[in-house]
Amino acid sequence: MSTAQYIERRFRANKVYITEKQRMGHYTRFDLWCGLIVNVYDTGRVVVQGRIRAFDYYDPLPAIRRILPFDTSWQFSRAKK
């Protein structure tokens, strides 16, 4: 099983909704409902980028951090409320 398939299964099992999944040249891109983009490269490297939408009632980041590998690169910002 590839890293992208493993991460996709973990997202689905933990109710982190994927709005779009695209296979690019040498990586798979997951667009998440909270506004983040997760790129999973064929080498196993994972990069998170984008801007998290502001929610008064929910912070999606702790659930996403538990799912992704510990050596994930984080390049994101938070939207202002």
What residue ranges belong to the model's regions?
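Mixed-charge, Lys/Arg-enriched low-complexity segments
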Residues: 53-81
